[in-house]
Amino acid sequence: MRELFRVRGFMPYVAMLFLNAFVDLGHKIVIQNTVFKIYDGTTQSALIAVVNALILLPFILLFSPAGHIANRYPRPRVMQLAAWAAVAVTLLITACYAMGWFWAAFALTLVLAGKSAFYSPAKYGYIREISGTDNIAAGNGIVQATTTVAILSGMFVFSFLFEKILATHTDAKTPADMLKLMIPLGCLLVGNSVVELALAYRLPVFTRDNNTEPFVARDYFRGVYLRANVATIREQRVIWLSIVGLATYWGLAQALIAVFPTFAEERLQQHNTVAIQAMLACTGIGVMLGSLVAGRLSRHHIETGLIPIGAVGIATCLALLPTVEHTVTTALLMLVVGVSGGLFIIPLNSLIQYQEKKEKIGTVLAGNNWV
């Protein structure tokens, strides 16, 4: 895996991935923690579920255009445009914080996710280009580990700063009051987006525009592209089954994230957002460890034997989770869920990228997000 860091452009690529995930997660943490402080019970769970839905919806609606763009244009160019969009959106988010516009900031979660819907196929499609076919699994392991570290960092940094700011302003009792205090966090989002933009221009370009066919909006709205793209991702059984496996995993992960704060509050009697985020972070630590292990075990090949091991680990831990009543035990279970998840997803992602033709990889990766 070390040899990848000697490849020109790989370090800027990894650093850019870190900042992208850090920014996307940071805004979500601010909104989620505000919801957690103001609302409780069913309302709290419903609003957190809506936040997660806003993050997922663009990946469904933008499946066809995101795949088309990732196929047509060099991936670094797509990531550069996405980085420009991130700067613009984080500026709007910071303005909403300053004005105390909670619901506008809430809605901008959808816009930020829309940017990610275009960014994601380019990001994963670039792994094969920069790491090479022989190191595709190792590249996936590093990318997943980096993204996970960024998520963990975002959880801790934004939750810590959120709690620290509120501790000195105990009179903030409404979403608007809380957001007005979060201007420094908005500035942090903007600053990271600017650095991400600079790094995006350090990525080497390996391909040229390879698809001159225009994107027809009418066919998009009539579902012509959708039917054709679904047929594309189902052409190869290995790719389709890998996508189904990843969709199942991420569906479980989203459900777990949505209900865990309420579970921690009512079952574990834990009301501190930092502590709750720390337990969720244990899952992230596990994913990071599992991804690195999977990447190391898959040097110069894809170790598919890790897939059933990961699946059994996830199922066992999720079955045990409702029976525990202690914070430490819960954290350990979440850690094992994460390790199992890393072992599960790295071979599946690698299989998709390895099996598909280069000219269709953008569509397949966007389809993976869509499913």
Residue ranges of model-derived segments:
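Cytoplasmic membrane-interface "Motif A"-like loop-to-helix N-cap segments
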Residues: R72-A86, R296-V312
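Helix-loop-helix hairpin linking two adjacent transmembrane segments in secondary transporters
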Residues: M99-A104, T147-A200
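Substrate-agnostic recognition of the 12-TM MFS/MFS-like secondary transporter fold
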Residues: M11-I29, V51-A70, P74-V89, A104-E163, ...
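Helix-loop junctions on the cytosolic side of multi-pass membrane transporters
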Residues: G125, E129, L181-A217
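C-terminal transmembrane helical hairpin of 12-TM major facilitator-type secondary transporters
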Residues: T304-I345
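C-terminal ends and interior cores of transmembrane alpha-helices
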Residues: W84-G100, V312-H326
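A single, central transmembrane helix in multi-pass transporters
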Residues: V14, F18-F22, G26-T34, I165-G186, ...
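Juxtamembrane intracellular "pre-TM" segments in multi-pass secondary transporters
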Residues: M1-M11, L203-V244
